[in-house]
């Protein structure tokens, strides 16, 4: 039952606050995958931003980056993209950078390169209220479906560490056959 749900689970975007011993917030995407011999595992792309430098404009301007990373994950999983090509797509997303709410480049992320231009759907964060809710030093992580493949928006807030109940909710619609 788990594999049936896992195989069709969406790509999830996340924003994870700084936690014990880690002075960085983590933004990224995680997707279900299966190798040629049938082993299931998640594939993850992350970007770390110093927690002390985080401000809401970072998330406000992250939509194109999430879109591009989700697209790269989907292509890799569905079409067997070579690792070098996948890495190139992720690095290109990072070089494209983030846009701030004002449309300019954010100083924190200036190391990522110039801002990206793209379609309006790619420029809107799927969860527009998130920048107002996310606390870089809090204990709640936020998860929402990546919509690069047309998946409907689903959201989740999770208190505490990354654990079985969280991944069960994301990848098996709450079914935990091993529990």
Predicted regions and their residues:
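N-terminal ordered "arm"
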Residues: 1-10
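Acidic/glycine-rich phosphate/pyrophosphate-binding loops and surrounding catalytic core
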Residues: 13-14
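Long protein-protein interaction modules used by eukaryotic assembly/scaffold proteins
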Residues: 20-179
